[in-house]
Amino acid sequence: MNFPWDQLLVKGNWMITMAQIGAPFLVIGLIAVITYFKLWKYLYKEWFTSVDHKKIGLMYLICAVLMFVRGGIDALLLRTQLTIPDNTFLESNHYNEIFSTHGVIMIIFMAMPFVFGLWNVVVPLQIGARDVAFPVMNNISFWLFFVGMILFNLSFIIGGSPAAGWTNYAPLAGEFSPGPGVNYYLVAIQISGIGTLMTGINFFVTILRCKTPTMKFMQMPMFTVTTFITTLIVILAFPVFTVVLALMTFDRVFGTAFFTVADGGMPMLWANFFWVWGHPEVYIVILPAFGIYSEIIPTFARKRLFGHQSMVWATAGIAFLSFLVWVHHFFTMGNGALINSFFSISTMLIGVPTGVKLFNWLLTLYKGRITFESPMLFSLAFIPNFLLGGVTGVMLAMASADYQYHNTYFLVAHFHYTLVTGVVFACLAGLIFWYPKMMGYKLNEKLNAWCFWLFMIGFNVCFLPQFILGLDGMPRRLYTYMPSDGWWLLNVISTIGALLMAVGFLFLVVSIVYSHIKAPREATGDNWDGLGRTLEWSTASAIPPKYNFAITPDWNDYDTFVDMKEHGRHYLDNHNYKDIHMPNNTHTGVIMGIFMLLGGFFLIFETVIPAAICLVGILGSLVYQSFVQDHGYHIPASEVAENEARLREARIKEREAVGHES
């Protein structure tokens, strides 16, 4: 089968042409830098093939930040186009491509890897584990995500981006979208989604089987609890999306008719399958974000989390209801009054467990000795802003009223008030909060504060006017409008807000660079002035030792670590060290990733035979891995004792230095 060379290059747009010219230079420059500093061996042995959950988490976070930049640039392009009426900055199809990629990147390739990165770094440390349950699978999962990310971003310069929206509805995404654009969507998300499913299974088993034996479920830190419940959503929801992506791939590549009315298919089948996955997907990123807030708020309020058990049950209730609300995304598609009523009520019910969480956070703050570090600022700003998103969500849940709001900018404002305040604020707060645990030093708090205030104010300036625009009738997915529509002023204000958000994010980037150069290094591990309340703060900072814990810690209550510090105890007071078994690195993830990248690329351009050859390579890699007799290695007890003695001495010196300064 011949390769469609005529579809390879995208023509006719100056931005794409610049990217096509610049991308090769960027890649060549990156390769040159790595080669000049002789980093290939180091990167391959210490990072690319690593099964250390902390390093894999950092790789996820780096990718997530890069995708935040890409998705943010997309958003600025959209806002620039809509700033003035009859704007010709973007033509219609390019606008459609950008808003399609913006949604996919922010949800699939920014929010999810951000969450997975924090899972990898924090969860095993919070439960007293030495690694995840399946370290090799963890490495493979990352490379599947990475390949999906690369393929999806490749569409901008090779073949053309998808232009059917992030929901990719049939039949628009079928016979009305020729070319490779939609194929990029289907294949890239399919590959990444398989990695996501593997991650969900891995962390589900990790929390069940690898936690310290004395830790009971109701005593787990809330971030771990929300992670565990989220993994259940991943395990139940992602197979649905995997199937529906495969069905549309078969429609487009092999000529089947699952979603084509003329041949007996049903376009609404896609909408139902998509949202059976799509709404739980919202909670796949929201629930861990709630867990992040539940760690930060008690830390800087210096109080135990109020209503810990009710928070656990509320999280479980939200997860259960998330599978019963998908039809609210298409109330206007003629479902009938009975069906709309059921899904309207189930949607409103989600407000009950969510309200429980909000009140628990507020009661945690009540009479707390609150300090306003930047993670706390993001957490406090989340509460009123997310509440506005929730209230407007209840408005949209009323099926009859939804006929007025549906597909207007009111809806756009609503889901940004839930996802940006619920997820993006949490990601930024979590990154700053656990940054010293990952890197051994805190980010500059003054620069972080600038980031917060500009980002939070810019967010409200950007999206509050969009509620009014929606009520005034401005449709979503609109690439231009006329002066007579009267939407110009509010769109200008909205664009100014988007620019403020971008400047705020730049302050975070400056903070990362500045702190890397100037910030003092810390060894105690309990980096926020000794306020840490969970086990990860008991270990060394800057990627703790590969084994995490020299001995298995005891955990008898939700606030065990706080009690230990108050009584002057440490989990290492017992010096009965033993040899520690650890897993070896793996090449399988990198090899599978290469086959996935090539096979996915050929499938996108419907070149089936090379894609099939790559599939054989993928299956061969898995078969080979299944026969590998790798029993790992042991860290001798003497080495553990020496390492822990060195860390203990560093902690003592650091505490003495702090004492002299105070």
UniProtKB/Swiss-Prot annotation:
Location within or outside the cell: Cell membrane
The record's PROSITE patterns line, in alphabetical order, gives:
COX1 (PS50855), COX1_CUB (PS00077)
Is Nucleus included in the keywords of this UniProt record? Answer: no
Give the matching Gene3D superfamilies: Cytochrome c oxidase-like, subunit I domain
Please spell out the taxonomic lineage of the organism that makes this protein: Bacteria, Bacillati, Bacillota, Bacilli, Bacillales
Q: What residue ranges are annotated as transmembrane?
A: 14-34, 58-78, 103-123, 140-160, 187-207, 228-248, 273-293, 311-331, 336-356, 376-396, 415-435, 451-471, 492-512, 586-605, 609-628
EC number(s) for this protein? 1.10.3.-
Keywords of the record, alphabetical order, are:
Cell membrane, Copper, Electron transport, Heme, Hydrogen ion transport, Ion transport, Iron, Membrane, Metal-binding, Oxidoreductase, Respiratory chain, Transmembrane, Transmembrane helix, Transport
Cross-link named 1'-histidyl-3'-tyrosine (His-Tyr), where? Answer: 279-283
Mention any one GO cellular component term assigned to this protein in its UniProt record.
plasma membrane
This protein's name: Probable quinol oxidase subunit 1
Topology within the bilayer: Multi-pass membrane protein
What's this chain's function? Catalyzes quinol oxidation with the concomitant reduction of oxygen to water.
> Which residues participate in Cu cation binding?
279, 283, 328-329
Query: What InterPro entries does the database record attribute to this sequence?
Result: Cyt_c_oxase-like_su1_dom, Cyt_c_oxase-like_su1_sf, Cyt_C_Oxase_1, Cyt_c_Oxase_su1_BS, QoxB
Q: Which GO terms describe its biological process?
A: electron transport coupled proton transport; oxidative phosphorylation; respiratory electron transport chain
Pathway(s) where this gene product acts: Energy metabolism; oxidative phosphorylation
According to the record, cofactor stoichiometry and binding are noted as:
Binds a copper B center. Heme A3.
Q: What gene is this protein a product of?
A: qoxB
